């Protein structure tokens, strides 16, 4: 199994593959790997000659220093999981110094307003951090395809916009959300929940599923009010936002249009641990 820590080494290693026009699939992660991440890797393995996985907790996308401090760092077990899946996967696990070269700061990006909604509204600067690291990693790896999960649907839309605006020659592949047995969306943050919280967090997806049913006959505003009311009586959960948006622009749905696709997004705090999820409303 090959593990690189320096960008110069990974670039040198991948260069002959690029010269031979081999396809390179790329799965960028922040570690604390779960089955959702592994499903992205499987997708890449099936569709590319080589697969690269990066493991890097990116400081510039955390607007809360406490969240960055508490984010799980489990490099050894992450490497074991990847090895069990396929020992030919190339791992790039850089240091902050290697990536940012002494300047740990974000660049500013314009994503045509995608960054102003939901996560962008509640986490100022977050998507500048995401854009900065994704662009840097793409420049290092030069992937043919890059794989992102739909759980972070807004991030997926933003990465697509980043690639389009910067004319990056990488195809972005969105992969379906993997869920636990109780339908809670798989997330590295789930590891910080107690067993009881993890069980009861099934309510998040159940609420989305019910909202989808209601959206068939009710307006977006009525569904949003119902979701807000549902969470008012829940002491364990604090609703940060629930939004029904146009799937393309991520703008809030004011009035339904049968020619558009809509998606519902939710963010909930469980004992200061933020969980997000979304569902297609078609």
From Swiss-Prot:
Signal peptide: none annotated. (R)-pantoate binds at residues 61, 155. Pathway: Cofactor biosynthesis; (R)-pantothenate biosynthesis; (R)-pantothenate from (R)-pantoate and beta-alanine: step 1/1. Its EC number is 6.3.2.1. It is found in: Cytoplasm. It comes from Flavobacterium psychrophilum (strain ATCC 49511 / DSM 21280 / CIP 103535 / JIP02/86). Belongs to the pantothenate synthetase family. Keywords: ATP-binding, Cytoplasm, Ligase, Nucleotide-binding, Pantothenate biosynthesis. NCBIfam families: cyt_tran_rel, panC. GO terms for biological process: pantothenate biosynthetic process. This is Pantothenate synthetase.
């Amino acid at each position: 199994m090959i593990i690189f820590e320096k960008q110069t080494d990974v670039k040198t290693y991948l260069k002959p593959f690029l010269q031979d026009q081999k396809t390179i699939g790329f799965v960028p992660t922040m570690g604390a790997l779960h089955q959702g991440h592994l499903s992205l890797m499987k997708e890449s393995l099936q569709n590319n000659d080589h697969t690269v996985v990066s493991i890097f907790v990116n400081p510039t996308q955390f607007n809360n220093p406490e969240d960055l401090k508490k984010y799980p760092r489990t490099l050894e077990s992450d490497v074991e999981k990847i090895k069990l899946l396929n020992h030919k996967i190339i791992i790039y696990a850089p240091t902050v110094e290697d990536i940012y070269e002494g300047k740990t700061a974000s660049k500013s990006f314009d994503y045509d307003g995608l960054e102003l909604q939901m996560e962008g509204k509640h986490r100022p600067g977050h998507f500048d951090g995401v854009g900065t690291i994704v662009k840097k990693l793409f420049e290092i790896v030069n992937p043919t395809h890059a794989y992102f999960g739909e759980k972070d649907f807004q991030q997926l839309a933003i990465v697509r916009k980043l690639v389009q605006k910067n004319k990056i020659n990488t195809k972005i592949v969105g992969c379906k959300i993997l869920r636990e047995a109780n339908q809670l969306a798989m997330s590295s943050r789930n590891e910080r929940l107690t067993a009881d919280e993890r069980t009861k967090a099934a309510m998040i997806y159940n609420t989305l599923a019910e909202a989808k049913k209601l959206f068939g006959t009710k307006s977006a505003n009525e569904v949003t009010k119902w979701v807000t009311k549902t969470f008012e009586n829940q002491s364990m959960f604090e609703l940060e936002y629930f939004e029904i948006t146009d799937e393309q622009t991520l703008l809030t749905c004011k009035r339904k249009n049968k020619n558009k696709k809509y998606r519902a997004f939710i963010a909930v705090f469980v004992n200061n641990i933020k969980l997000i999820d979304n569902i297609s409303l078609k």
